[in-house]
């Protein structure tokens, strides 16, 4: 009976250890995913800033030429 208790205790102990290791790995993966999401959001904001700067430079060159043409057609 004592050997059965020891075996059962060993199985339970190893089960708890493996569960705790799995939980740690899952937490680490979740943290890594959150970091990647943060990096992706930063990259997205950089892309948006790049897009707005391109649109701004296009607007600087196009608007002064388009406004007089529109004014001629309307007036």
From Swiss-Prot:
Keywords tagged on the record: Amidation, Amphibian defense peptide, Antibiotic, Antimicrobial, Cleavage on pair of basic residues, Immunity, Innate immunity, Membrane, Secreted, Signal, Target cell membrane, Target membrane
Expression sites by tissue: Expressed by the skin glands.
Cell compartments where the protein resides: Secreted; Target cell membrane
Coiled coil: none
Biased composition range(s): Acidic residues: 30-45
Name of one Pfam family that matches: Caerin_1
Propeptide, residue positions: 23-49
Organism of derivation: Ranoidea caerulea
GO biological process: defense response to bacterium; innate immune response
Gene Ontology cellular-component terms listed: extracellular region; membrane; other organism cell membrane
Region (Disordered): 24-48
Protein name: Caerin 1.11
Family of this protein: Belongs to the frog skin active peptide (FSAP) family. Caerin subfamily.
Job description of the protein: Cationic amphipathic alpha-helical antimicrobial peptide with weak or no activity against both Gram-positive and Gram-negative bacteria. Is weakly active against E.coli (MIC=25 uM), E.cloacae (MIC=50 uM), K.pneumoniae (MIC=25 uM), and S.haemolyticus (MIC=50 uM). Has no activity against S.typhimurium, S.enteritidis, B.megaterium, and S.aureus (MIC>100 uM).
UniProt-listed InterPro entries: Caerin_1, Frog_antimicrobial_propeptide, FSAP
Signal peptide: 1-22
Sites of Leucine amide modification: 74
């Amino acid at each position: 009976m004592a050997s059965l208790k020891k075996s059962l205790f060993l199985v339970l102990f190893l089960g708890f250890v493996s569960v705790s290791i799995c939980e740690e790995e899952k937490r680490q993966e979740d943290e890594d995913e959150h970091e990647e999401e943060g990096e992706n959001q930063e990259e997205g904001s950089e892309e948006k800033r790049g897009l707005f700067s391109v649109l701004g430079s296009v607007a600087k060159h196009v608007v002064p030429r388009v406004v007089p043409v529109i004014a001629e057609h309307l007036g």
